[in-house]
Amino acid sequence: MSTNLNPFMNNTPSSSPLKGSESKRVSKRPISSSSSASLLSSPSRRSRPSTVYGDRYIPSRTDIDFNSIVSISSMASVPALNPSSTEDQVEYQKERQAHETYNTLLKNELFGEMLSKDTVGSESSIDRIKNTRPSTRGNVHAENTTRHGYELERVSTPPPEAAGLEEFSPHSTPVTPRRLFTSQQDEITRPSSNSVRGASLLTYQQRKGRRLSAASLLQSQFFDSMSPVRPDSKQLLLSPGKQFRQIAKVPYRVLDAPSLADDFYYSLIDWSSTDVLAVALGKSIFLTDNNTGDVVHLCDTENEYTSLSWIGAGSHLAVGQANGLVEIYDVMKRKCIRTLSGHIDRVACLSWNNHVLTSGSRDHRILHRDVRMPDPFFETIESHTQEVCGLKWNVADNKLASGGNDNVVHVYEGTSKSPILTFDEHKAAVKAMAWSPHKRGVLATGGGTADRRLKIWNVNTSIKMSDIDSGSQICNMVWSKNTNELVTSHGYSKYNLTLWDCNSMDPIAILKGHSFRVLHLTLSNDGTTVVSGAGDETLRYWKLFDKPKAKVQPNSLIFDAFNQIR
């Protein structure tokens, strides 16, 4: 008895024994070719009558719903700025103005016709839309009262009978709606004859004129009186918007600075009043004359330079070293004229007040030196418990601010030993400090990585005026001479510069380009350019401010005549 190993080949059982006898009685009838074809042919679906559909039915509004205006005005807006995460305030304001213009234009095109019917006095529909305030979401659809004289009705699609239209029958002929506005381009490509159905669709006139320029198309489609844009919308688009300040986000000059130290406590660049930039690169100091572009090698040392600072007149340069010595160079002679001792560790900060040079060191001490005296220093201050990493003189008010690695800021009156004020709110080292050239007694301080906060103090009233989270380590700062704005340089983890509006404390611009901490910062004598230096061994020149406008001098003849009056 043979068995089949393939279960799928003979899986169907044989005839049932109960039906076996009946199957023998079934007689075979002859099958015609037509019937066999019908049996073997594939089943087909029953044909259905074809339906011809017309063009889309465009709904229209029966009544203007003022709630729709409110709903549009309550759409999601640009999120509020956070100074720690925003890119810059100017770009935000530009984007906000574009959003507001678009929203106003959209609402005026949708609802302007109805609004213009109920204008009071000289108020236009644009003014009414701008003065519309969004309602709360839960009350927009619940109110049934009238607002501004309009009945609050929902926007609805009218039935065909109300719109004066007939319903489309399944056998109606499709009709393309006629355009409401024609353009010059339509006249050029219009068919040559009023042909009836069945005529050639490709029978067109030849183009009579040359191809229209983009300006001509814009003139014909938008500025033309036949334009579908409402006149007040045109006026809105053509009206000049708010002019924003243009700030260059790219440095206009980049210089290689090999061996520029990447040390948070160093201060290695400074700009003189004679427009000469001094840079300490490793064990050498170079001078760059920005008027001529000449670069001069000033000096070398066996130690490492850690700080430098120009005297107010720009004739002498003070240089601090890692061994604690301070040298003073005559720039014209390119010669060291004096070496001052007193510190036993590196000198990380220097600041001048006329003929008084103040130095701060890692030995926790501040020394006042009168360069006219033979003694290397005449006063010692030991207010800080750790390294002194920031010093700034306010020459106009004769006040000194010092910041230390102990997170403390001290303010001194002149060369006194004891501070008159102490600020201890920072949570990291305070190196970055700047006095306001516009308001007396206003001091800005910035904290390190663990703090990241920019604080502005009024030392005359002992009041903290501002406290902003900058988002990253503040390494240095300069206050603009020409505007009430502040530039801060940052380290971990943004490596950028931030321009702040000191009135609102909003970031105006973020300047990117450095790939390491921006530790060194200085301002040009005319107050227009900021130079930044970083551990990526580059110096970048940023044009941020305009020159101050010259003051109009009174008529000399009238002034002289006035002075002659006794």
Swiss-Prot record:
Lineage: Eukaryota, Fungi, Dikarya, Ascomycota, Saccharomycotina
Family the entry assigns: Belongs to the WD repeat CDC20/Fizzy family.
Keyword annotations of the record: Cell cycle, Cell division, Cytoplasm, Mitosis, Nucleus, Phosphoprotein, Repeat, WD repeat
Localization per record: Cytoplasm; Nucleus
Modified sites of kind Phosphoserine: S213
Effect of T176A: Abolishes phosphorylation
Listed InterPro entries: Cdc20/Fizzy (IPR033010), WD40/YVTN_repeat-like_dom_sf (IPR015943), WD40_CDC20-Fz (IPR056150), WD40_repeat_CS (IPR019775), WD40_repeat_dom_sf (IPR036322), WD40_rpt (IPR001680)
Role, per record: Activator protein that regulates the ubiquitin ligase activity and substrate specificity of the anaphase promoting complex/cyclosome (APC/C). During telophase and in the subsequent G1 phase of the cell cycle, recognizes and binds proteins containing a destruction box (D-box) and an additional degradation signal termed the KEN box including ASE1, CDC20, the B-type cyclins CLB2 and CLB3, the polo-like kinase CDC5 and HSL1, and recruits them in a C-box-dependent manner to the APC/C for ubiquitination and subsequent proteolysis.
Segments carrying motif C-box: 55-61
GO biological process, one term: positive regulation of protein catabolic process
Residue spans of biased composition, Polar residues class: 1-18
PANTHER family (alphabetical): CELL DIVISION CYCLE 20 CDC20 FIZZY -RELATED, FIZZY-RELATED PROTEIN HOMOLOG
GO molecular function, one term: ubiquitin ligase activator activity
Keyword Repeat tagged: yes
Domain of life: Eukaryota
Main location: cytoplasm
Record note on modification: Phosphorylated at multiple sites by CDC28, probably in its CLB5 bound form, in S, G2 and M phase of the cell cycle, thereby blocking the association of CDH1 to the APC/C and promoting nuclear export of CDH1 by MSN5. Dephosphorylated and activated by CDC14 in late anaphase, which may be necessary for PSE1-dependent nuclear localization.
Name of encoding gene: CDH1
PROSITE patterns (UniProt xref): WD_REPEATS_1, WD_REPEATS_2, WD_REPEATS_REGION
A single Gene Ontology CC term: cytoplasm
Disordered: annotated segments: 1-56
Matches recorded under SMART domains: WD40
Effect annotated for changing T157A: Abolishes phosphorylation
Subunit: Associates with the APC/C complex. Interacts with CLB2, CLB3, CDC5, HSL1, MSN5 and PSE1.
Domain notes: The C-box is required for the association with the APC/C complex.
The protein, known as: APC/C activator protein CDH1
Start-end of Low complexity biased regions: 29-44
